[in-house]
């Protein structure tokens, strides 16, 4: 049964022809699974709300939709009854509200009054329910959808007892990546000196694009950013507002009609997607000749600018687990957290104090769900977690693209035994070196993992790529392309040795790929693997889409424009070697840039 596209309502907002077409595409995409799983289809107006928030980029709007749905499910924001306790009291507390004026650009203005928040008296998920409820009321307006939202965090008269770091992180994550509204700016007003420390923690989550929108202001400076007509009296404005009664206007006459999102939120999307939809080039895919022409037209600077378009986008999802105080020491770098939505979860074992956290993310490959696990270079305090992950995910191949030290800095710990017949024990897992092969550009080590609890043994092949320079990228992609083929061949042989698998199952376990942070060289390696697979099977590829999608699973993948440009260069180098383009033609063009 084909999903039906919701008709455009008579009272729907006016859209351009391009926006209407994007809305139809969005609804077709979302309603594929609403039909399949007997969930009510999404309405036209709700679709427009998500598309407005992402400037009618269909792919990003779909990602936002699922992030919004998952956030509401995770935080228990479902079946809201604003006339019943405790939600009613939380709404009427006045700590969060929507002003009845707009800024000069037409943006709606939301106000959080910190001094009214008392964490010891509030239940956090109820606070979030009230926040969602009131924000939803704001973005029901087409004007707000089109012109965005200004968020004022009023800290005047508050103290440390009014502050809740975890709530602050959740609200920020909500505003920047999990709510259908264009966030224009955040004004933090009257922040005490002690706020600098928690803000520095929160700011680790922010991309430059979001950080630039946040202003920390004195009360006297607010009118430089918003006219007095848009501000309450206590912030130097003209609006008379009684926070104790203001929010009565947002309560419905009765509990109202059921939220159509309740059914969608409560529905659990199956964990496995159709492999044929994973990392398949979209409508903007290029043939290899089109790619040559594209690179010659854009040139190096143009490709760098294309990367900046990707980098400026906020991560889609949340980082709650990575930023939990108990897990911070497990992150090699404080500014490289791990998305909650795609993180690998370890099994908690009785008698052990470990959490289920490791800084590692499932990443899709070409036509394969969870083809890779992108992770950081293990720290001494995470060696055991690393090998537990390898065991639990039935990993057969590990790819390391860094050395232990580079440029005089420690990049990765020695988490496996280096010499033949040596072994290291990690809890109930013992890792033994069965042999080492030293090649020109890489080292191959065969390892055996012995699970003493289950009395089982498995072999894992560890590859360490040695030809990546300490700084920048390789001058030629030849050695990396050869290395990638060796890795793929080893994975295929290892999977084959497991025996035939029935049709419909995941064809193979993930390959673990890591560098130091687990995003730069790791993202480059995986992007190249995906794009070359696209090219070999379909004759077309899409670098921009591949990297953009990858960053929704392993946030910040590909760290520099140089690495992004290297992907293009490597693909063209591969194409020349395979005779897909005339020898020397494409590389000469690139080398001249």
From Swiss-Prot:
Active-site residues, record numbering mapped to chain: 515 (phosphocysteine intermediate)
Cystines in this chain: none
UniProt GO MF annotations: protein tyrosine phosphatase activity
Alphabetical list of InterPro entries matching this protein: CRAL-TRIO_dom, CRAL-TRIO_dom_sf, CRAL/TRIO_N_dom_sf, Prot-tyrosine_phosphatase-like, Protein-Tyr_Phosphatase, PTP_cat, Tyr_Pase_AS, Tyr_Pase_cat
Key words of the record: Acetylation, Cytoplasm, Hydrolase, Protein phosphatase
Domain CRAL-TRIO span(s) in chain numbering: 84-243
Modified residues (N-acetylmethionine): 1
GO BP term (any one): negative regulation of neuron projection development
CDD domains the UniProt entry points to: PTPc-N9, SEC14
Its EC number(s): 3.1.3.48
Cited SUPFAM superfamilies: (Phosphotyrosine protein) phosphatases II (SSF52799), CRAL/TRIO domain (SSF52087), CRAL/TRIO N-terminal domain (SSF46938)
Domain Tyrosine-protein phosphatase: residue ranges: 303-574
Ligand binding (substrate): 470, 515-521, 559
Disordered: annotated segments: 1-21
Superkingdom assignment: Eukaryota
Chain's role: Protein-tyrosine phosphatase that could participate in the transfer of hydrophobic ligands or in functions of the Golgi apparatus.
Name listed for the protein in its UniProt record: Tyrosine-protein phosphatase non-receptor type 9
